[in-house]
Amino acid sequence: MTDYCYPKAKRLLKPAEFKPVFNQPLFKVHQTHFMAFAYDSDHLQARLGMAITKKKIPTAVARNTIKRIIREQFRHTHAQLPALDVVFILKKSTKALSNEQMRQEISDILSKVISKQRRATAADVKHKDK
């Protein structure tokens, strides 16, 4: 059975944990409203960080809704995610989006993270074989 909890071990909490993700990302995944940075983690499981700014989303209620949706999608796909640190940022306002549209965009990003990491891992294996 899959563990759907979201303990502190699965979160990026300190600025020092966010810094390498932003400065040296393994890759980035773009969508219309969101962007995710992925960094190869030393941890055994994927960890999530969020940088949802007041400048893009002025109300706390809206920011918290976005964070809740990101956390929920992360929890449901965590089992498939490789050991990466993933940080979500907001590219532009989500006022025009419904919660379902946000879920879909975030889910698409997480799917792309999984496929990009698999391709990168497969490429590493090919280079080691040569």
Swiss-Prot record:
Catalytic activity, reaction form: Endonucleolytic cleavage of RNA, removing 5'-extranucleotides from tRNA precursor
UniProt keywords, alphabetically: Endonuclease, Hydrolase, Nuclease, RNA-binding, tRNA processing
UniProt family annotation: Belongs to the RnpA family.
Disulphide linkage map: none
GO process annotations (BP): tRNA 5'-leader removal
Protein name (database record): Ribonuclease P protein component
HAMAP family (alphabetical): RNase_P
Functional summary from the UniProt entry: RNaseP catalyzes the removal of the 5'-leader sequence from pre-tRNA to produce the mature 5'-terminus. It can also cleave other RNA substrates such as 4.5S RNA. The protein component plays an auxiliary but essential role in vivo by binding to the 5'-leader sequence and broadening the substrate specificity of the ribozyme.
SUPFAM superfamilies: Ribosomal protein S5 domain 2-like
